[in-house]
Amino acid sequence: MAFLILLRHGKSVWNEKNLFTGWVDIPLSQQGIDEAIHAGQVIKDLPIDCIFTSSLVRSLMTALLAMTHHSSKKIPYIIHDDEQQKLMSRIYSDEEKSMIPLYRSSALNERMYGELQGKNKKETAEEFGEEQVKLWRRSYKISPPGGESLYDTGLRTVPYFQETIFPLLKNSKNVFISAHGNSLRSLIMDIEKLSEEEVLSLELPTGKPIVYLWTGHTFERHPEPLG
């Protein structure tokens, strides 16, 4: 058995400005920082063996802030993809036992919003029409100009989860994923076997952990909302 913790990052500066963010690398706002800290207090007693974030800083900030409250007192350390940096950052002492590996991957990045990135959501609706923007944002396979649909997002998140993260869970490793609304929705769609209609109605608030237990055969969602 193993725990899987999913956490949408805390509110970002552009969330507060009502701007499409996507892959633009925007940090957390003060509210987002507070949300990440609160989330850490909620999950502080759940076992965590490894952490995964997207390549975007708001996802990383959320994970690091949340872990400052973990009861294990273990320190996250980033495992870099670059082989030279990985070699140069090796730890040669027992200090490694007091740390938790953190892996970053663009496979977990937010849905890329293409030509909408940086634009105000209200002004975009006025420019293109509310129905068109609703199609871009809330349909499953329709993507904004130059961007990704939720379906496209799942084409990178789900294989990464199945090939990299799921084997750890099957090996009884407890995993914490700090990512984004749409990347997590695509993962939950796969985990819970949701239909297209069901995933479109799925809303994930910022800074609210979702916890699953991998039983060895299936994922069981924690029955009560956390936090």
Curated annotation (Swiss-Prot):
Q: Which SMART domains match?
A: PGAM (SM00855)
Q: What is this protein called?
A: 2,3-bisphosphoglycerate-dependent phosphoglycerate mutase
Q: Which superkingdom does the taxonomy of this entry point to? A: Bacteria
What is the stated purpose of this protein? Catalyzes the interconversion of 2-phosphoglycerate and 3-phosphoglycerate.
Q: Which ranges form a coiled coil?
A: none
Pathway(s) of this molecule: Carbohydrate degradation; glycolysis; pyruvate from D-glyceraldehyde 3-phosphate: step 3/5
Q: What is its EC number?
A: 5.4.2.11
Isomerase: is it a keyword of this entry?
Answer: yes
Which gene name belongs to this protein? gpmA
Q: Which molecular-function annotations from GO does this UniProt entry contain?
A: phosphoglycerate mutase activity
Q: Which controlled-vocabulary keywords does the entry list?
A: Gluconeogenesis, Glycolysis, Isomerase
Organism lineage reads as: Bacteria, Pseudomonadati, Chlamydiota, Chlamydiia, Chlamydiales
Q: Which CDD domains match?
A: HP_PGM_like (cd07067)
Instruction: Name the residues annotated as catalytic in the UniProt entry.
Output: 9 (tele-phosphohistidine intermediate), 110 (proton donor/acceptor)
- Pfam families attached to this UniProt entry: His_Phos_1 (PF00300)
Reaction(s) catalysed by this chain, per the record, are:
(2R)-2-phosphoglycerate = (2R)-3-phosphoglycerate
User: What are its GO biological-process terms?
Assistant: gluconeogenesis; glycolytic process
Give yes or no: UniProt keyword Hydrolase: no
Q: Which family does it belong to?
A: Belongs to the phosphoglycerate mutase family. BPG-dependent PGAM subfamily.
NCBIfam families, A to Z: PRK01112.1 (NF002217)
The record places the site described as Transition state stabilizer at 180
- Which positions are annotated as binding substrate? 8-15, 21-22, 58, 110-113, 121, 137-138, 181-182
